[in-house]
């Protein structure tokens, strides 16, 4: 893996701490804007251990096991041991997940197809690039050694990496090849 790159899986379940350095939960997912070039993280899904408030709203009773989507502007720092938020619990700004692309939910392990609907393979890993506190989508990692179609996939990935002038790992499809993410499949430009 190239310097500055990391896998989505390495961030999932990472501890999340508020502005007072209290553990409030863990990272559950990341929302990305695929229209941006390169695609950038827009929101962070945090699995809270418990809360009696959502933003400024007081709940009728405390709840456990709730996932809130917070805008990326809430992220103060990304450290190896934790994600640090700008505000203290429970004073977070909250976003709706409606219309958002969440990498864990919508991309990881999703079936990839070409524009004609031919099945290619599943997404094995999502590769991100970190620049300061920002995260960008680099590409989609695919395994090529376990499947009979491995050589065909290897040729396809090589072709895509040359098309988008991307050096690096031979088994990573560049983000530029992603056409769209549908409910049932991720469409790749071949």
Segments and roles (model prediction):
Residues 1-190:
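Peripheral interaction segments used for macromolecular assembly
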């Amino acid at each position: 893996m190239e310097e500055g790159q990391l896998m989505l899986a390495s961030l999932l379940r990472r501890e999340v701490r508020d502005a007072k350095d209290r553990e409030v939960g863990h990272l559950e997912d990341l929302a990305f804007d695929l229209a941006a070039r390169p695609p950038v993280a827009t929101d962070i899904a945090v699995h809270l251990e418990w809360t009696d408030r959502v933003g400024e709203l007081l709940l009728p009773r405390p709840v456990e096991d709730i996932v809130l989507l917070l805008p990326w502007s809430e992220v103060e720092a990304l450290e190896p041991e934790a994600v640090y938020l700008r505000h203290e619990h429970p004073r977070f700004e909250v976003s709706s997940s409606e219309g958002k692309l969440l990498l864990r939910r919508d991309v990881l392990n999703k079936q990839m197809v070409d524009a004609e609907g031919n099945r290619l393979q599943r997404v094995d890993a999502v590769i991100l690039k970190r620049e300061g506190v920002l995260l960008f989508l680099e590409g989609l990692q695919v395994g090529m050694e376990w499947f009979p179609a491995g050589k065909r996939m290897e040729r396809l990935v090589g072709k895509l990496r040359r098309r988008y002038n991307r050096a690096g790992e031979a088994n990573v499809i560049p983000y530029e090849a992603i056409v769209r993410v549908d409910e049932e499949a991720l469409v790749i430009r071949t």
